[in-house]
């Protein structure tokens, strides 16, 4: 398949720049895969689609304020990972001239480049004292949000159930849920730390030539058993799908617990094995996430749904509306 097969026209004004006033004040498109019927509902009506034997699976990763600025404000440093508390893998902008031995000052911390991982800007940096994300860091809002992060984003660009530090981006399907709704749903958690690769476009013309970014995940034995035993598994977000499909045993069909890194790339005609329903936001044209949801339904049905979403002026992307695929 071609990357261009997943393109659609999206007016800029439909890209949500801010969250709704309250969590859950969103529209919800409901897609029935068996009939092709598309409904236009409100997220507040989600309870109508919850079944007694469901298990709703959420990603409990927590977004870390991982974006820093040098004291001279000439460089932006995005923490991608940590080899130790003081040795970070970073994306530095501009970073092409940042060679081994160069130093960066962030507050009272001094970082020294100890390795060049990628000429464009990925560096290993060793700090004398690590900068503090909570007091010095900024949230790395997605590039399609055309404003700087604000204090309110620390609450709204975070799920209410986030607990495992390590994500650069939020698992945005979960942003619609408040504590009251969570308490009413039979649920459990997996962890996938969403990385900066989630924003990178597909550069290859053919899907099979695209190399997926790697992300760290964890699935406990207890949760794996609950999912195997569930009558219907509802994944809240594409990140949950990536964890579960990465952990399916090819022979038994059951889930293997554990932790590791996944580079799974899901696109048609891949058949999902561990998920029965999916709640997700609306995704970018030609993105790997649009390809994933197309594998779960079909490319034709998904593009039809997106065309209706544009015509009906749904709000798109991280702070936007959602879609329930049954």
Residue ranges and their predicted role:
Residues 1-326:
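Surface-exposed, charge/polar-rich loops and edge strands
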